[in-house]
């Protein structure tokens, strides 16, 4: 699930800019392992199980064709031949006679470069011309391609099957099998499947509008009219899935894509499964903020009801721009979800509120079905003549004769009408069927396939002159031209290859190898500014090696990054630009690129050097920090834990709009997915699934991070260890392409030290180890700044990171209080990779190992590096997928004690834990009413934590089960003493509000005097209250057994424009009239 980690990095996506110098003219060997360069073994491909088979290599002469006469890997219309140069590289060549890239010594360098550029652009797979690479990962890469017959753009995912174990292959083919059954206008389409012994090609629908998540980040919450239009499409698509006995199980804003017309496309069916009445499922998968209560409770479920709950969370997110349930760790989120309490924004209509109450029902038996939801009043406002009804799929035997006639003309030399009709009627998902499907799609703008749009794909931040040239080049592009998307791995939450463009993202939602998922990621805001290269730009040669897919996965995707950027095996990407180019930008120099639509951060052949690129990128990113794109930081109130109680302050330095989560220490080469026996059904007997055997030993994705533990916390651990012993296995740290050997050794040493430190309090005071945040793996967190954390926090000073430090109060998202202790501190380095990351899809992005410890152990993480689970501006796309039963422990030897993010701590429940108030509100843009000291701070971009992957699902579920045992009693939130919130009296100040027209009660008294007066009046009126922060009180009045119960909060705020202080009233629950009555009475009685 989303907040529990980035463990599952099966296809950790890589921004194409990482291979900046890996073009055809580069002198660096692109492949050092010659055995990966496989020669073609056949001239003709065959058809396997209704799947077109593409050859894995080129031929020595002629054009390789499939059974349907389709060239599969041709360049320039000729044959694709691979000759080895002296540097050990393979070069595709064209022409009738020459098989060498360097034809003669007398040939000019200019003509050679032109030929190389022509070859790069003319690579074909089947009937698709590959335009550019838009995503790379450990096991797959994604190419933006153009169907040569219809001219439509598609996204081709190229998957290395040899890197997958049989279980992962089963999950992959189950996903493909499900996608083949789907035909809905709001679900991503699968057009074609091509397969060789080593490679699987999936041709998927391309969507250029990006993700709904990024739309919300760019524009803030939707008006209800706009949200209704989108939500009707979502409900229609999910109801269609349920009608076919399919559940999605990972519905969230990140998996909702937009096409060029801003229509919804549901993506990512990696966790989908079929269901049947009577056969309950028990796999806990999805994203925690979107997960239904029964998943947290460990109960089995039928299926559709978990999707219905997720739809309720999505509706709330669309209308409010925030999540209804939030928390700083899994335990806190679980409590809030199980209570089912959420805030209703004042601007939400009554009809929308009533509809939410049908979705967000704790008892799954009482949750409405989607058939009833479709009849709801809010769903049909403005659609009285078009009431939402279940989608009726067109009959399979309904054939479009016009398209058939076109197919006959197209394939007249190879197939007769009977063969064409058979392919279409039987839905073979091969060339003929794919062409038939694409002929039915709306034709795209041909201008987007121009040479300028095909070549201007560099992701670098270019100079002003280059930007001017790019601006001229983009005049020839359509404003609706799509931008590149990126592929992301289920097993990677941090390395999302973000490719940018105003058009949005590529819809790579279709498939994932069990945990290897190439979902479309939103394109990067920063890369969107870099966008176009001058017309002379030459794309990287990695687009020419389609016939040698295996080397592309492990060589090109990591070799250059490990050379140029030791910190990132998967190059950091940046956030996308708005689909329609409406994002406010501070730099006038980049305004001309707001319509850069065809630009894609794909290849980086024209970049002088990676160092120059990074410097230019940093310079532009500093200019592009936009307040409307930032989410607020939080400063949790200090914990009153006795003499050793430490305070927590989050730094608030201005953060560049880029991803810093390139530190991936666990890049597995063999994804492992465990699932329920009752869920891995007949697919295991599917004859179409090749069981790959003989796969060499692979490194384990499990990485045991080190611990940062203070002396007082270690004493608690020692006491708790007698009750719940833990296992620590330093050997579970494994080398990966993204962690250089020197960093790996540092991680190993720190882990050993932390392991021994768990038994000796003195060991926790060892000197901090040098750990550069950009180079350290996120799952191998060292105590690089533990001493600095303890020193600064014990003195009560806010932690510094970057240029400034501020404190910000964040109100809890529900009336429940957290019961965890947390200590945060910035990295020792001055990198702009800040530790406190606000997440949307899981605002507490926590790695699963953080929840694999016994819940009686309190772990306080100090001094996180940017490898913490809150990577700034990084999409933590994690999907939790595993058993929910306590006794189903993992067999992969993962640690019980995992890495604990900077601001996340799993503490002992009950009185033994320090109650710490505050929660992370993943505010999207334009939601600034909770900003603290807005005049003196900038806010971080809300990053996303996605869904939790498969390999650690069982351990996380076991941790949840342990939490359930401890929380077996009624969920009564512990009320922290007022003294606890007062530890930093001298440092905490009231929030400053810029807009004061809604402030009815003002005073010139000191804030503390106002708080005393408020408490006195509340006592006089018989109101129950809880002081959540120093200047905020949560109030309750009325009888909980009747409808008269009202909850609201009162906060003392500064009004700088009036030079006064004010009291802010905010209704949380209860009727409006009831709130107005009690609020007016209290306001009148306040003697301020």
Swiss-Prot record:
Sequence ranges of Basic and acidic residues compositional bias: 715-729, 882-891
Keywords tagged on the record: ATP-binding, Cytoplasm, Developmental protein, Kinase, Magnesium, Metal-binding, Nucleotide-binding, Serine/threonine-protein kinase, Transferase
Compartments in which it is found: Cytoplasm, Cell cortex
Region named Disordered: 1-121, 466-524, 556-581, 602-622, 638-953, 967-987
Record field: catalytic activity: L-seryl-[protein] + ATP = O-phospho-L-seryl-[protein] + ADP + H(+); L-threonyl-[protein] + ATP = O-phospho-L-threonyl-[protein] + ADP + H(+)
Domain UBA intervals: 398-440
Entry-linked Gene3D superfamilies: DNA helicase RuvA subunit, C-terminal domain, Kinase associated domain 1, KA1, Phosphorylase Kinase, domain 1, Transferase(Phosphotransferase) domain 1
Annotated ranges, domain KA1: 1039-1088
Any single biological process term in GO: microtubule cytoskeleton organization
EC number(s) from the headed UniProt entry: 2.7.11.1
GO CC terms of this entry: cell cortex; cytoplasm
Entry binding sites for ATP: 134-142, 157
Active-site residues, Swiss-Prot/TrEMBL: 250
Segments of skewed composition (Polar residues): 13-29, 39-49, 556-571, 733-745, 757-775, 838-853
An MF annotation (GO) of this entry: ATP binding
Cofactors required: Mg(2+)
Protein kinase domain location: 128-379
Taxonomic superkingdom: Eukaryota
Skewed-composition ranges (Low complexity): 50-114, 466-500, 638-656, 776-829, 854-869
Function, as annotated: Required for cytoplasmic partitioning and asymmetric cell division in early embryogenesis. Phosphorylates and restricts the asymmetry effector mex-5 (and possibly also mex-6) to the anterior cytoplasm of the zygote. Regulates mes-1 expression during early embryogenesis. Critical role in postembryonic vulval morphogenesis.
Family recorded in the similarity comment: Belongs to the protein kinase superfamily. CAMK Ser/Thr protein kinase family. SNF1 subfamily.
The protein, known as: Serine/threonine-protein kinase par-1
Native species: Caenorhabditis briggsae
Gene assigned in the entry: par-1
């Amino acid at each position: 699930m989303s907040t529990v980690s980035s463990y599952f990095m099966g296809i950790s996506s890589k921004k194409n800019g990482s291979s900046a110098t890996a073009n055809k003219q580069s002198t660096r060997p692109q492949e050092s392992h010659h055995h990966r360069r496989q020669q073609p073994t056949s001239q003709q491909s065959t058809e396997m199980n209704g799947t077109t088979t593409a050859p894995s290599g080129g031929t020595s002469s002629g054009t390789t064709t499939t059974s349907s006469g389709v060239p599969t890997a041709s360049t320039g219309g000729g044959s694709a031949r691979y000759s080895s140069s002296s540097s050990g590289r393979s070069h595709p060549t064209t022409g009738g006679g020459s098989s060498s890239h360097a034809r003669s010594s007398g040939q000019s360098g200019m003509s050679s470069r032109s030929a190389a550029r022509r070859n790069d652009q003319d690579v074909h797979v089947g009937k698709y011309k590959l335009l550019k690479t838009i995503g790379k990962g450990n096991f797959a890469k994604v190419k933006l391609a153009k169907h040569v017959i219809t001219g439509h753009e598609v996204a081709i995912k190229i998957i290395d099957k040899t890197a997958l174990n049989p279980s992962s292959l089963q999950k992959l083919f189950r996903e493909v099998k499900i996608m083949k059954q789907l035909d809905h206008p709001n679900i991503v389409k699968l057009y074609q499947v091509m397969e060789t012994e080593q490679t699987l090609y999936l041709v998927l629908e391309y969507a250029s509008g990006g993700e709904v998540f990024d739309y919300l980040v760019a524009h803030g919450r939707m008006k209800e009219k706009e949200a209704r239009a989108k939500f009707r499409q979502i409900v229609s698509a999910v109801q269609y899935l349920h009608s076919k006995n399919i559940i999605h199980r990972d519905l969230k804003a990140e998996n909702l894509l937009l096409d060029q017309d801003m229509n919804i496309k549901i993506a990512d069916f990696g966790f989908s499964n079929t269901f049947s009445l009577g056969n309950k499922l028990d796999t806990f998968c999805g994203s925690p903020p979107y997960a239904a209560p029964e998943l947290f409770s460990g109960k089995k479920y039928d299926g559709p009801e978990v999707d219905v709950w997720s739809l309720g969370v999505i509706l709330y997110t669309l209308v409010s721009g925030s999540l209804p349930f939030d928390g700083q760790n899994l335990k806190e989120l679980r409590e809030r979800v199980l209570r089912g309490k959420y805030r209703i924004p004042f601007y939400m209509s009554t009809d929308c509120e009533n509809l939410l109450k049908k979705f967000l029902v704790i008892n799954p038996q009482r949750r409405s079905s989607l058939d009833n939801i479709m009849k709801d009043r809010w769903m049909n406002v403005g659609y009285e003549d078009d009431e939402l009804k279940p989608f009726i799929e067109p009959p399979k035997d309904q054939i479009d004769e016009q398209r058939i006639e076109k197919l006959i003309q197209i394939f007249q030399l190879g197939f007769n009408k009977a063969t064409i009709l058979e392919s279409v009627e039987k839905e073979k998902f091969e060339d003929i069927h794919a062409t038939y499907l694409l002929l039915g799609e709306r034709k795209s703008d041909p201008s987007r396939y121009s040479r300028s749009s095909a070549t201007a794909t560099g992701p670098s931040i270019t100079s002003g002159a280059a930007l001017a040239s790019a601006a001229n080049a983009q005049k020839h592009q359509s404003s609706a031209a799509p931008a590149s998307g990126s592929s992301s791995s289920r097993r990677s939450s941090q390395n999302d290859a973000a490719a940018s463009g105003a058009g949005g993202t590529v819809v790579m939602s279709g498939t994932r190898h069990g945990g290897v998922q190439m979902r479309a990621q939103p394109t990067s805001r920063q890369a969107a500014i870099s966008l176009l290269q001058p017309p002379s730009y030459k794309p990287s040669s990695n687009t020419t090696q389609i016939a040698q897919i295996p080397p592309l996965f492990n060589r090109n995707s990591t070799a250059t990054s490990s050379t140029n950027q030791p910190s990132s095996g998967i190059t950091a990407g940046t956030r996308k630009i708005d689909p329609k180019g409406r994002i406010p930008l501070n730099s006038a120099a980049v305004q001309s690129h707001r319509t850069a639509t065809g630009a894609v951060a794909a290849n980086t052949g024209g970049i002088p050097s990676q160092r120059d690129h990074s410097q230019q990128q940093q310079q532009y990113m500093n200019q592009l920090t936009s307040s409307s794109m930032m989410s607020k930081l939080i400063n949790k109130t200090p914990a009153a834990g006795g003499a050793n109680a430490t305070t927590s302050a989050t730094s608030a330095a201005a953060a560049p709009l880029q991803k810093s989560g390139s530190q991936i220490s666990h890049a597995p080469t063999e994804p492992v997915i465990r699932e329920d026996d009752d869920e891995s059904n007949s697919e295991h007997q599917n004859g179409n699934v090749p069981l790959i055997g003989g796969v060499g030993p692979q490194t384990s994705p499990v990485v045991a991070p080190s611990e940062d533990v203070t002396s007082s916390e270690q004493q608690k651990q020692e006491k708790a260890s007698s009750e719940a012993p833990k296992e620590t296995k330093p050997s579970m740290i494994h080398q990966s392409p993204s962690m250089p050997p020197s960093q790996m050794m540092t991680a190993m040493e720190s882990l050993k030290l932390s392991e021994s430190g768990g038994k000796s309090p003195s060991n926790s005071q060892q000197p901090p180890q040098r750990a550069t945040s950009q180079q350290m793996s996120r799952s191998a967190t060292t105590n690089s700044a533990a001493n600095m954390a303890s020193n600064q926090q014990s003195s009560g000073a806010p932690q510094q990171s970057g240029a400034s430090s501020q404190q910000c109060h964040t109100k809890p998202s529900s009336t429940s209080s957290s019961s965890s202790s947390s200590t945060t501190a910035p990295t020792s380095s001055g990198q702009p990779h800040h530790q406190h990351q606000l997440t949307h899809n899981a605002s507490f992005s926590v790695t699963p190992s953080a929840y694999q410890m016994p819940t009686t152990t309190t772990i306080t993480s100090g001094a996180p590096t940017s490898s913490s689970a809150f990577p700034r501006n990084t999409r933590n796309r994690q999907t939790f997928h595993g058993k929910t039963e306590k006794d189903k422990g993992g067999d992969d030897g993962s640690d019980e004690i995992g890495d604990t993010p900077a601001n996340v701590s799993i503490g002992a429940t009950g009185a033994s834990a320090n109650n710490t108030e505050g929660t992370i509100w993943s505010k999207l843009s334009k939601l600034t009413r909770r900003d603290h000291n807005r005049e003196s701070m900038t806010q971080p971009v809300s990053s996303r934590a996605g869904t939790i992957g498969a390999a650690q699902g069982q351990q996380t579920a076991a941790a949840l089960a342990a939490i359930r045992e401890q929380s077996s009693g009624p969920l009564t939130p512990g009320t922290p003493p007022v003294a606890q919130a007062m530890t930093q009296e001298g440092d905490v100040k009231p929030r400053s509000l810029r807009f004061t027209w809604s402030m009815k009660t003002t005073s010139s008294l000191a804030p503390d005097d106002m708080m005393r007066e408020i408490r006195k009046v509340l006592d006089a009126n018989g109101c129950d209250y809880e002081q959540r922060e120093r200047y905020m009180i949560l109030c309750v009045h009325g009888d909980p057994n009747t409808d008269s119960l009202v909850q609201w909060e009162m906060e003392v705020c500064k009004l700088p424009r009036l030079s006064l202080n004010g009291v802010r009233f905010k209704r949380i629950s209860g009727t409006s009239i009831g709130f107005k009555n009690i609020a007016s009475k209290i306001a009148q009685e306040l003697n301020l």
